[in-house]
């Protein structure tokens, strides 16, 4: 019987992101900081840790030191770059690879890898803004929008989140839903406060928070003649059943519109046998 020493065979370290090496592992979200374990076969080994994601590659940056992940012994922490999401404009998750180059002193031992999968956080979504204008010029005249007269021009702008394109628009205005970036409403149908809101949805299917704006809409009704009487009279307006003049008395109501509305009254008359009316302005 006897004994003999066995030669140490250096084998590259097998990295893991969570527990099991050599499998793609769901590590959380882009922007999260994860632990990468070297699982080294010798305490003499050091490592350089690299990443590959889509067409991007490079040396990982240690989240604790801010330096490149070289001379790593047992493990380190890495923040998955949020910029990776720019390569995922139409999906909400993506996979990459962690490569670990193992060294024994200055001697290169080999490279092994593990995969990882990260998701786009729910907080990553587009944003929306809106511009709302009076499309009729009514607001400039009366200081407010006016029911039955004003129309709104609404322009919705969507801002991409990590290069995910804006795919659709949803605008709610005047009780109607629109699906275009620029719209003009029909005439406003309700008085009081009207609110315009809009959202955008991107290529990942993420919908923005609503952008909204509220406006006061003045009530408006068409002018109404509430009283009208006609009598024969003299030139001075005194009653005379045989007079050669006609005295017209009337009352009418118009909507104030911030005391900026005015009225012009017209009287039309004709002989019974005539076809056309004659119109005069009344004061």
Predicted region positions:
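Short, solvent-exposed loop/turn segments at the edges of extracellular beta-sandwich modules
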Residues: 103-108, 201-206
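Extracellular interdomain linker/stem segments of modular secreted and single-pass surface proteins
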Residues: 9-18, 117-128, 216-225
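Hydrophobic/tyrosine-rich beta-strand signature of extracellular beta-sandwich/beta-rich modules
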Residues: 98-100, 198
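Acidic, Ser/Thr
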Residues: 37-44, 148-163, 249-259
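Short beta-strand segments within Ig-like beta-sandwich modules, predominantly Fibronectin type-III
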Residues: 66-72, 174-182, 279-283
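Surface-exposed, short loops/turns at beta-strand junctions within beta-sandwich domains
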Residues: 80-97, 108, 184-194, 283
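Short, solvent-exposed loop/linker segments at the N-terminal edge
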Residues: 22-32, 134-151, 232-245
């Amino acid at each position: 019987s006897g004994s003999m020493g066995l030669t140490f065979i250096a084998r590259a370290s097998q990295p893991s992101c969570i527990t099991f090496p050599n499998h793609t592992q769901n590590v959380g979200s882009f922007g999260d900081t994860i632990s990468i374990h070297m699982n080294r076969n010798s305490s003499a080994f050091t490592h350089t840790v690299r990443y590959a994601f889509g067409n991007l590659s490079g040396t990982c940056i240690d989240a604790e030191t801010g330096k490149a992940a070289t001379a790593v012994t047992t493990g380190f922490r890495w923040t998955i770059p949020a910029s990776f999401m720019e390569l995922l404009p139409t999906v909400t998750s993506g996979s990459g690879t962690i490569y670990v180059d193992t060294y024994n002193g200055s001697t290169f031992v080999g490279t092994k890898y593990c995969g990882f999968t990260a998701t786009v956080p729910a907080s990553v979504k587009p944003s929306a803004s809106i511009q709302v204008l009076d499309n009729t010029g009514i607001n400039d005249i009366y200081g407010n929008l006016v029911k039955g007269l004003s129309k709104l021009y609404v322009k919705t702008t969507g801002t991409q989140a990590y290069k995910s394109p804006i795919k659709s628009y949803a605008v709610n205005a005047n009780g109607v839903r629109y699906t275009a970036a620029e719209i003009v409403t029909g005439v406003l149908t309700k008085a009081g406060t009207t609110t315009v809101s809009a959202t955008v949805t991107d290529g990942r299917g993420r919908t923005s928070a609503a952008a909204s704006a509220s406006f006061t809409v003045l009530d408006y009704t068409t002018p109404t003649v509430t009283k009208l009487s006609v009598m024969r009279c003299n030139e001075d307006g005194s009653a005379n059943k045989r007079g050669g003049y006609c005295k017209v008395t009337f009352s009418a109501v118009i909507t104030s519109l911030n005391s900026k509305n005015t009225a012009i009254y017209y009287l039309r008359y004709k002989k019974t046998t005539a076809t056309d009316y004659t119109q005069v302005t009344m004061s």
